[in-house]
């Protein structure tokens, strides 16, 4: 296996909170998959949840080397957790097509958060 891409992002949680306060659900609806949206609505700390998801999706867009454009959207990168809570990515629509085009075999996700920040790294392997 070879590393095809690596992306990291850090988000100041208060910035996400300010956007949510200003625009309501718009940001969450734009970046979350339908499944993530359900978790967001029920989460005890929805802004923190949203900030962490945003960081992962930004890191994924960087790892793919594309950013969010040319048919890619944040909600095409879905963060899912295994039984132990380990995060991974499920790809949809153009993101899934791009993964096939690039020969992606594995996606690795790590994420961390503290009081003020959420940080994520995504590694893509062939």
UniProtKB/Swiss-Prot annotation:
The keyword Metal-binding applies. It comes from the Bacteria. It is an enzyme of class 2 (transferase). This is Holo-[acyl-carrier-protein] synthase. The keyword Mitochondrion does not apply. It catalyses: apo-[ACP] + CoA = holo-[ACP] + adenosine 3',5'-bisphosphate + H(+). GO terms for cellular component: cytoplasm. Its EC number is 2.7.8.7. It is found in: Cytoplasm. Its cofactor is Mg(2+). Belongs to the P-Pant transferase superfamily. AcpS family. Coiled coil: none annotated. Keywords: Cytoplasm, Fatty acid biosynthesis, Fatty acid metabolism, Lipid biosynthesis, Lipid metabolism, Magnesium, Metal-binding, Transferase.
């Amino acid at each position: 296996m070879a590393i095809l891409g690596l992306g990291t992002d850090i988000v100041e949680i208060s910035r996400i909170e300010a956007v949510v306060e200003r625009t309501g659900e718009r940001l969450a609806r734009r970046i979350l998959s339908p499944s993530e949206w359900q978790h967001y609505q029920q989460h005890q700390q929805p802004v923190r949840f949203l900030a962490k998801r945003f960081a992962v999706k930004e890191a994924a867009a960087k790892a793919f080397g594309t950013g969010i454009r040319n048919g890619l959207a944040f909600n095409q990168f879905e963060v899912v957790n295994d039984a132990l809570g380990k995060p991974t990515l499920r790809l949809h629509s153009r993101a899934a097509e791009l993964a096939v085009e690039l020969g992606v075999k594995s996606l690795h996700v790590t994420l961390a958060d503290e009081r003020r920040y959420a940080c994520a790294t995504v590694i893509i392997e062939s």
